[in-house]
Amino acid sequence: ALLVGSMLITLLRHADRVKIACLAQLVNVIAPIMTSDTGAWRQTIFYPYMHASVYGRGTVLNTQVLTPVYESKTYGEAPYLDSVCIWDEENDALTIFAVNKSLDEDMEVSCDLRQFERCRLAEHIVLTNDDMKAVNTEADPNHVTPTHSDATKLENGKMHTVLGKHSWNVIRLTK
């Protein structure tokens, strides 16, 4: 789910150039929704797709992110925090998608949102599991599902939160 979340964040960040993208995972081997003769269940990758589809509408904001980095074997330095902000003018809503890619540490995040001072915190959705290889199955279809976090605080246009280690996050502010 973290890889899919980061991929979607990258697509959204480049929405000025990427006008269409295709999802190859529409067959049952690695589909977001799996089926069998007796039922259907959502894979963990379903949730970032759903969140991006529902809340990733509007204008992608040009944000400046200062984040710790790690050294990748192939591409040099890579950020631990992957994020994008979307302003949905039609619904007066700001959505922040964020992935904490750290395997070991939660991440404190602060955002200057004074331009959106009239907004209030609507919700902070988190998808994570202590076992990074955890999956949903037909026998246990809700093993990894989104939960709500109360770690996010919004005060005087400043947002402070903690993103759990290896987590997908959706933070929504509305008027």
Which residues fall in each region the model found?
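Aromatic/acidic polysaccharide-binding cleft in carbohydrate-active enzymes
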Residues: 1-83, 89-92
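Active-site proximal loops enriched in glycine and acidic residues that flank catalytic Cys/His/Asp
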Residues: 22-25, 37, 64-65, 98-102, ...
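Carbohydrate-binding surface patches
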Residues: 78-118, 124, 169
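Beta-strand-rich interaction surfaces with strong enrichment in secreted/lumenal proteins
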Residues: 98, 158-161
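Solvent-exposed, conformationally flexible loop/turn segments
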Residues: 104, 156-157, 165-166
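Acidic, Ser/Thr/Pro-rich beta/coil linker or hinge segments at domain junctions
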Residues: 117-159
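Short Pro-Gly-centered flexible turn/kink motifs
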Residues: 162-173
